[in-house]
Swiss-Prot record:
The gene is trhO. SMART domains: RHOD. Residues 311-326 have a biased composition (Basic and acidic residues). One of its GO terms (molecular function) is oxidoreductase activity, acting on paired donors, with incorporation or reduction of molecular oxygen. Catalyzes oxygen-dependent 5-hydroxyuridine (ho5U) modification at position 34 in tRNAs. This is tRNA uridine(34) hydroxylase. It is an enzyme of class 1 (oxidoreductase). It comes from Vibrio campbellii (strain ATCC BAA-1116).
Length: 326
């Protein structure tokens, strides 16, 4: 069985004085080996974290003990290695950034559709199916027949709707995203724009892959995830992708065989797009990563800081011994 539990969670709820949650939440995560990032805002909480079973259970218990966060929505998958290097709790204006004022899924939202009912909905020729994720995510996998809005960030989605969709023409709209949170915002936005029948996949793609057998599935490809696994397959296991450390886009084994690929410096998607200064910086970073690997250490994250401190302490102790022997 995989060693780490990866937990994606969110809840839209009014969090007055949300800033006060940051320190106790961060302290609990650090004390129980929970890595990843949580976002706090006045509209709620969102994030993905990973830890051993005990760490995730402790975090979820803490969140459910907070009255405003009780009943938080979460989905679990698994990883053989820790997919995050750091532990962060960030304060934000929005927990998922649409960039449109006044959109509140707590008051207006689309109709939730269970994974078991999703196939029938998107097979309906009268339903316009939209993937609300970014272009690089959709490139890895999507639902059969879904429209790609060709967005680089979620902030671009409202412009896509304004330029390409019409409430009179698109009377039934079905939307989906990785874990469900982007659709909370996007369906709320579309309802505000006058679209009447707006549906979204409850629990997102991850819940669909978990509950719908692959032989019945309308999902094609793999699912991009925002952690070290890069993507997961239909069994929610790590798929055959890595991340280019220069552009942070997913790459395949074929990409790595390209002449334009240099580990940590470039890939076919970003080759020639970085300045000479950036390339030099990437090469130096890759050199430090390699040196850390030789020492059996991490180059980034909380553990790397501890390892550097330990190395410095050992050097100082050695110098002290040499001084006393002199």
């Amino acid at each position: 069985m995989s060693q780490y539990v990866v937990c994606a969670l969110y809840k839209f709820v009014e969090l007055e004085n949300y800033q006060e949650l940051r320190e106790p939440l961060l302290a609990l995560m650090e004390a129980h080996g929970v890595h990843g990032t949580l976002l706090l805002a006045s509209e709620g909480i969102n994030g993905t974290v990973a830890a051993k079973r005990e760490g995730i259970d402790t975090l979820l218990a803490w969140l459910n003990d907070e009255p405003r966060l009780n009943g938080i929505v979460y989905k679990e998958s698994y990883s053989d290695t820790q997919p995050f290097n750091r532990t962060k709790v960030k304060l934000k204006k929005e927990i998922v950034t649409l960039g449109v004022e006044g959109i509140d899924p707590r008051h207006v939202v689309g109709t939730y559709v269970k994974p078991q009912d999703w196939n029938d909905l998107i097979a309906d020729p009268e339903v316009f199916v939209v993937d609300t994720r970014n272009d690089y995510e959709i490139e890895i996998g999507t639902f059969k027949g879904a429209v790609n809005p060709n967005t680089d960030t979620f902030r671009e989605f409202p412009d896509y709707v304004k330029q390409n969709m019409d409430p009179e023409k698109h009377k039934k709209v079905a939307m989906f995203c990785t874990g469900g949170i982007r659709c909370e915002k996007s369906t709320a936005y579309m309802k505000e724009q006058g679209f009447d029948e707006v549906y979204h996949l409850e629990g997102g793609i991850l819940k669909y892959l978990e509950e719908v057998p692959e032989e019945e599935s309308m999902w094609e490809g793999d699912c991009y995830v925002f952690d070290g696994r890069v993507a997961v397959n239909h069994q929610l296991e790590k798929a055959d992708y890595d991340l280019c450390n220069a552009c942070r886009l997913p790459i395949t084994e074929e990409d790595k065989r390209s002449e334009q690929f240099e580990q940590g410096v470039s890939c076919p998607k970003c080759f020639g797009k970085h300045s000479e200064e950036q390339v030099a910086r990437f090469r130096e970073r890759e050199k430090q990563v390699s040196l850390a690997a030789v020492r059996g250490e991490q180059h980034v994250g909380g553990e790397s800081a501890k390892q550097r401190q330990q190395r410095r302490a050992e050097k100082l102790a050695k110098k002290d011994v040499q001084r006393k022997q002199a």
